Amino acid sequence: MKPSPAGTAKELEPPAPARGEQRTAEPEGRWREKGEADTERQRTRERQEATLAGLAELEYLRQRQELLVRGALRGAGGAGAAAPRAGELLGEAAQRSRLEEKFLEENILLLRKQLNCLRRRDAGLLNQLQELDKQISDLRLDVEKTSEEHLETDSRPSSGFYELSDGASGSLSNSSNSVFSECLSSCHSSTCFCSPLEATLSLSDGCPKSADLIGLLEYKEGHCEDQASGAVCRSLSTPQFNSLDVIADVNPKYQCDLVSKNGNDVYRYPSPLHAVAVQSPMFLLCLTGNPLREEDRLGNHASDICGGSELDAVKTDSSLPSPSSLWSASHPSSSKKMDGYILSLVQKKTHPVRTNKPRTSVNADPTKGLLRNGSVCVRAPGGVSQGNSVNLKNSKQACLPSGGIPSLNNGTFSPPKQWSKESKAEQAESKRVPLPEGCPSGAASDLQSKHLPKTAKPASQEHARCSAIGTGESPKESAQLSGASPKESPSRGPAPPQENKVVQPLKKMSQKNSLQGVPPATPPLLSTAFPVEERPALDFKSEGSSQSLEEAHLVKAQFIPGQQPSVRLHRGHRNMGVVKNSSLKHRGPALQGLENGLPTVREKTRAGSKKCRFPDDLDTNKKLKKASSKGRKSGGGPEAGVPGRPAGGGHRAGSRAHGHGREAVVAKPKHKRTDYRRWKSSAEISYEEALRRARRGRRENVGLYPAPVPLPYASPYAYVASDSEYSAECESLFHSTVVDTSEDEQSNYTTNCFGDSESSVSEGEFVGESTTTSDSEESGGLIWSQFVQTLPIQTVTAPDLHNHPAKTFVKIKASHNLKKKILRFRSGSLKLMTTV
C-alpha cells in the first residue's frame, strides 16, 4: 500500500502482465503526481500568503509610524494655537479610533473565520466518515469478490480501495487540505485552537491514504501547527511538505512574534522584518523547538494587536499547549508523531482501567494484606529446612485460622527462628490474653516479652543457642513454635491435625536431622501441644525444642514464677523441655487433658509424647490434641483459656500452678498405642544423654532454670549420660511399679509417668532429650519421649503436686502396658529394653 518508487516505475513501464498490478501502479502514479502538484501549489500559495502578510504588516507599520510622527510633530508644534492643537488632537484621536476599529474589525473577521473553520471541519469530518464508510464497504465487497474471484483477478483493484485512495484519498486530501488548511489559515491568527483538531483530522484523513501521504499530511499539519503556535512556518525555504499546508485565507500565523535561533532576540509581530523573517530558516528551528513559547508570544502579540478581550481569549487558547504545538515539536519524524498520538490515546483509555489495580490487593487494609500474605511469610522461614517448612506451614495454618494477626507477625519475622519464637510467645500470650491463641504469634511474643521480660530474654538466649547449635533447629523450632501455638489453642484444633500430618514427615526428617546433629522441626502438633523451650544443645536436636520455646513463651506469659521463666529460657519451662520436646508436645495435649481432668488425655499425652517423635505419634498427638482441647473446653483448664495455655505449655510450672500433675498421675496409659516407635539404641541413648548434659550445662551456666525448675527439667538421667542409666531408666519404667511421688521433683515426673520415680524421671528427661534427638534421628526412643512428655505433664514440681492434692500422682503399674505397647510398636524396642 505504501507508495514507493516502484509504483512510479510500474506506471511508466509497459503494462504488467497482471491487471491488478497495472491498476495498482496507475493509481499510485496518479496519486504521486497529484501529491507533487499539490505540494507545488502549496508552496506557491504559502509564498504568496507570506508576501501578502508582509505587505499588510508593512502597511500597518506605516500607518502606526505615521501616527507616531504626527503625534511627535504635534507635540513639537505645541507653540501653535490651542485651537489648532485641539483640532490636531481631535484628528489624532479620530485616527486612533479608526485604527482601533480596524483592529476590532480584523479580530471579528478572524473570529468569523474560526467559526467557518469549525463548521468546515465538521463538514470535513462528516465527509471523512462517509468516505471511510465507503472504503469499508468497498473493502467488504472486495473480500467477498476475492473469495469468489481470487484466482481470476486481483482483489485490490476490485475492492476499490486503490481507487478510493486515488480519488477518495484525493477527496480526503482535498477535504483535509482545503477545509483544514482554510481552518488553519483562519485560525492560526486566532491562536489556532482549531489547528490541533485539524492536525488530528488531517492525520485521520491521511490514514486511508498510503503511509507516504500520511507522512506528508502530518508534516504539513506539523508546519501548520507550528505556524499557528507562533513557530516560524516552514515556508519556501523548507522544500518539504510545507506546501501541503493549504491556507485559503491570508494566514494570520504571520502575525505571531518571531524568536531568533538563539532565542535571545524576539521580534514582536508588528515589525518590518516579521513578514520576511517568518519565511527565514533562522527562526524555523528555534520556533519549532519552542512551540509553546511561540504560542505564548503569539497570544501576546495577538492581544497587543487586537487589544480586545476576544483576542485575549484567543491568546489564552494559543497559550495553552495545543496538540498541534506538541505535534509540531515532533514533526521532524511523522512516525514519532503517530506513535505519540496512539500512545496518548491508549493511555487515555488505559487510565480508567488502572482503577482496577486495587483488585490486586483484595484488602485495602495493610494488615489484611499482610494476613493474606502471611502464609508466604511463614513459608519463607520454613524454607530453611523441610521439617521447618512443614512446621512453619502448620503453624501458619494453625495461627492464621485462629487469628489473622499471626500472618502479620510472620511477615515481621526476619529469621525463621526468631519469627517462630515470637509466634510461639505471641501465641502463648494470645492464649493468656484474649488474643486469638494462634493469631498474633508476633503479638503474643510481644506480650510475653512485656509480661516476662526475663523469661523472654532467656528464651531468646535459648533460641540464639539453638541457632548456634544448628540453623536447622532454629527454623524447625520456629516452625514448631508456630505449629505448637496452633495446637495449643483449641481454636487451632483443626490446624493441629494438619500440623500432625505435616509433622509425621517432619518427624522423620527431624529424626534424620537429629542424627545429623540438627534437630528436625518438631511436629507442629507436638509443638502445639507443648512448645518446649529450646535448649542450647538438645533443642536443635529435639523436635519439640521449638515447642518448648512456644510453650515457654506461653508459660512466660502465664507463669511469671522464676521456674517458668527459667523454663521459658530457650529450654522451655522444664529442663526436660528440650529433651522432652516431643514428650512436651505430647505433654501439651496431655497437660491439657490433665487440666481438663481427663486421664485419657494424660494417656494420650504419653502416646502423644511418643508421637512427638514419630509419625504415628502424630496421630496420637492429634488424639491428644482433641482430648486436650476437649479437656480445655470441659475443664476450662489453663489451656482452655489463654492462661491455661501457658500452663499447658509449661508443664512444670503450669502443672504445679494448675495442678497438672494430678491429671498426669490420674491418667494411666489407657490407649494402647499402635504407633509406638522402636526403642533407641544404647548409642542413641548415650548420644541423647550427652546432648542433655550439654544442654543442662548450658542451662546451669546461663542460670536459665531456678534450682527447683532445673531439677525437673534436668532429670538425674538428663545429667547422667551413661547408656546403662538410660537402660536402667527404661527397665524401671517397664518395671512395674510406679512409685508415688519421690522426694525429687524430677523423680515425681518420671514416677508419675512411668512408674519408677527416679528412673522414670531420668528416663523422662533423658528420654525426652535423647528421644528428641534420637527420635529425630529415628532412633526409636519415641516411647521414652512419649513417656517423658507424659512425665513433663506429671512432672509438676513436688510442691505443685502437694499444693494440688487432686493432682497427686497415682501409683500405676505401667510396665506391663508399656511392654505391650512396645511390643505392638516394635519388637526391637522390647529387645533393647531387655538387653538394657
Curated annotation (Swiss-Prot):
Domain of life according to the entry: Eukaryota
Alphabetic keyword roster: Coiled coil, Cytoplasm, Deafness, Developmental protein, Disease variant, Neurogenesis, Nucleus, Phosphoprotein, Synapse, Wnt signaling pathway
Region listing for Disordered, in residue ranges: 1-47, 316-335, 350-374, 401-521, 588-679
Biased composition (Low complexity): 318-335
Subcellular location: Cytoplasm; Nucleus; Synapse
InterPro entries with a match to the protein in the record: Dapper
PTM sites of type Phosphoserine: 237, 827
Extent of Polar residues compositional bias: 407-417
A molecular function (GO) term: delta-catenin binding
Coiled-coil ranges (or none): 92-156
Chain residue ranges for the region called Required for self-association: 92-156
Record's compositionally biased regions (Basic residues): 623-633
Pfam families referenced in this protein's UniProt entry, alphabetically: Dapper
Phenotype when changing residue 808 to K: Found in a patient with encephalocele; uncertain significance
Phenotypic consequence of residue 237 to A: Impairs interaction with YWHAB. Abolishes interaction with YWHAB
Role summary: Involved in regulation of intracellular signaling pathways during development. Specifically thought to play a role in canonical and/or non-canonical Wnt signaling pathways through interaction with DSH (Dishevelled) family proteins. The activation/inhibition of Wnt signaling may depend on the phosphorylation status. Proposed to regulate the degradation of CTNNB1/beta-catenin, thereby modulating the transcriptional activation of target genes of the Wnt signaling pathway. Its function in stabilizing CTNNB1 may involve inhibition of GSK3B activity. Promotes the membrane localization of CTNNB1.
Name of the molecule in the record: Dapper homolog 1
Organism this protein belongs to: Homo sapiens (Human)
